[in-house]
């Protein structure tokens, strides 16, 4: 993994250290009634938990660009394989996490493209909350789920 200008910690006004000097973004990928979940490698922040592909945005990237770059790096997908629905923002004043909600098109075949993932699984929406979720994703899952198409 190459160093990027967005890599680094932010001491947030909420009292939590967040990864991403310029904010962060991830992709919540939908297929039928399932979402793509990433079992995070043990060596990453909150390793061993489940979440969505994502990470720090660089200074020159929009949150959509950052989420797409991270999705390509982590799960091997590109913009032509998804249809973006909308972006949901979790704002903390001086830091943000944007979740790009998108449908996986028929030509979308995610795979663990780097060592940040132990595995990927398509999980039924109603089963996600029972998983050992990344703490930030766990806090936001019900709000995200309630607004899914």
What residue spans do the PLM features occupy?
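Catalytic phosphate/metal-binding cores of nucleic-acid and nucleotide-processing enzymes, i.e., regions
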Residues: 17-19, 49, 65, 85
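Unchanged
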Residues: 55-149
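Acidic surface patches and DE-rich sequence motifs
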Residues: 5, 31, 90
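Conserved Nudix-box catalytic region and its N-terminal flanking loop in Nudix hydrolases
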Residues: 30-74
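Acidic, metal-coordinating catalytic segment for phosphate/diphosphate chemistry
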Residues: 1-26
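A generic fold-level signal
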Residues: 19-22, 30, 44-45, 92-95, ...
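Ordered hydrophobic segments in well-structured contexts
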Residues: 28, 36, 99-101
């Amino acid at each position: 993994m190459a160093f990027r200008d967005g890599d680094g910690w932010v001491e947030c006004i909420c009292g939590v250290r967040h990864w991403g000097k310029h904010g962060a973004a991830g992709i919540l990928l939908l297929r039928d009634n399932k979402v793509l979940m990433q079992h995070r490698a043990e060596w990453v922040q909150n390793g061993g938990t489940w979440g969505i592909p994502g990470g720090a945005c660089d200074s020159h990237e929009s949150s959509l660009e950052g989420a797409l770059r991270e999705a390509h790096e982590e799960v091997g997908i590109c913009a032509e394989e998804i249809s973006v629905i909308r972006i949901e923002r979790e704002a903390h004043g001086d830091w943000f996490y944007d979740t790009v909600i998108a449908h996986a098109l028929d030509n979308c075949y995610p795979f663990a493209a780097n060592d940040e993932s132990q595995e990927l699984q398509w999980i039924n929406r109603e089963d996600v909350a029972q998983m050992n979720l990344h703490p930030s994703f766990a806090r936001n899952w019900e709000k995200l789920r309630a607004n899914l198409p």
